[in-house]
Amino acid sequence: MKDSSNLLEMRNISKEFPGVKALDNVTLKVKKGSVHALMGENGAGKSTLMKCLFGIYHPNSGEIFISGQKVQFKNSKHALDNGVSMVHQELNQVRERNVMDNLWLGRYPKKGLFIDEKKMYDETEKIFKDLDINVNPRDKVSTLSVSQMQMVEIAKAVSYKSKIIVMDEPTSSLTEKEVSHLFKIINKLRKQGISIIYISHKMEEILEISDEVTIMRDGKWIATEKASDLTMDLIIKLMVGRELTDRFPKKDHIPKETILEVNNLSDAKNELKNVSFKLRKGEILGIAGLVGAKRTETLETLFGLREKGSGDIILHGKKVDNSKPFKAMQNGFALVTEERRQTGIFGKLPIDFNSIIANIDSYKTSTGLLSNGRISKDTQWVINSMKVKTPSQKTLIGSLSGGNQQKIVIGKWLLRKPEILLLDEPTRGIDVGAKFEIYQLINELAKEDKGIIMVSSEMPELLGVCDRILVMSNGMISGIVNANQTTQEEIMHLSAKYLSVTGGVNNANQIKEKV
């Protein structure tokens, strides 16, 4: 007999792929009008379970019940038509069409033979008003922020009269204010009796918004608990199967002499204003700041992705020309970008291609063809040295967990033997166990005398991994602090230092470095 309080029951779900048992007898029960968090390390089976619910995969065994009725969705459209929606981490929208087109694509309201644009507009406006979404239905999607695009996807789910909405890492690219707005919308949906399955690695958010939490590990159900009964330490223990006594590895690298000097660096748009700092060999230099501080822009200017306006980049005491990425690469710089899926990997291509793409010319033989032997050897080096979990070099990189994808992105750059490694949000979208492995890798690279500059929005990460932290505010440096002598409060204070400044430049002489 099914529990009438459960809107969704997935019972004993198993799913196998060639050589891999992705799900092993997993049960998930979600109450009506609740927020049910689904947690686990990358590769735990969360996405596979949701794809079984959404009709993308068909389980080898097990049953799915919605409102007590057994269902078996043929595909995602079948799931949508029956009240199950999914808001993907990679937002699936037609950017050059307007908002209401995206909302009603493939099911436009008709007036005779023609699309009823007035009805489409009115219906969209009504949903937006109900959810407190401040977006014009006639605006092009390409003009929206990531947060607004996400709201449109949620509105689309509501337009399908969904009873269950799956949200996959919904806050990964949102500001604190946008997260707060999202939570207000989730609470409105909850009051309407809609159930939310919320997938995230951000434990603070999980504990704030969720009613219940289900934790998975290695394709198995581990526990389902009330969120109010959980702590971050207990969640970590359940996720990884062991206690993590330290979230960060011991800093056992020793910074040496200065390797890089950046003097009065500004970009051509003058969004960066006279940024100056030094980086030592074997040092991990963090960059902190609020959204809009121009942290990513700093890395992009150093790497030649963004046009430099003025200033000098000095490596080993000599000025270098990093006006283009290929020149920066020749000068020993490497950049791991923030948006891994968009700019870091070729998701539909195999691991071997993704491992050698940054150095592809070096694999050409005298005939102009690529040396498959050398490609295989170097790919295996990346897999082994980065501890990538994969069945084959030919596995599509897009099928790997976020942590394994990021290891390959870092590994491809290490094949070029860079001296300066620029890391932009290197652990974004990566689970707690894989994060620790990335931290260990960064520490090992520092021990090999690489100079590392790391942007992160996670304050504990900067304090736990870095030697010094450069704080930015409104495109300017507001302070450089020693990581083991500062606090989150001091960094936040420095982050807000120039928020009222609309012009002018930063006086480097006013910066007090705590070293």
Curated annotation (Swiss-Prot):
Enzyme class: translocase
Disulfide bond entries: none
Topology versus the membrane: Peripheral membrane protein
Binding site for ATP: 40-47
Catalytic activity: D-galactose(out) + ATP + H2O = D-galactose(in) + ADP + phosphate + H(+); methyl beta-D-galactoside(out) + ATP + H2O = methyl beta-D-galactoside(in) + ADP + phosphate + H(+)
Gene Ontology molecular functions: ATP binding; ATP hydrolysis activity
InterPro entries attached to this UniProt entry: AAA+_ATPase, ABC_carbohydrate_import_ATPase, ABC_transporter-like_ATP-bd, ABC_transporter-like_CS, P-loop_NTPase
Enzyme Commission numbers on file: 7.5.2.11
Pfam families linked: ABC_tran
SMART domains registered for this protein in UniProt: AAA
UniProt function note: Part of the ABC transporter complex MglABC involved in galactose/methyl galactoside import. Responsible for energy coupling to the transport system.
Subunit structure: The complex is composed of one ATP-binding protein (MglA), two transmembrane proteins (MglC) and a solute-binding protein (MglB).
Family as reported in the entry's similarity comment: Belongs to the ABC transporter superfamily. Galactose/methyl galactoside importer (TC 3.A.1.2.3) family.
Protein name (record): Galactose/methyl galactoside import ATP-binding protein MglA
Lineage: Bacteria, Bacillati, Bacillota, Clostridia, Eubacteriales
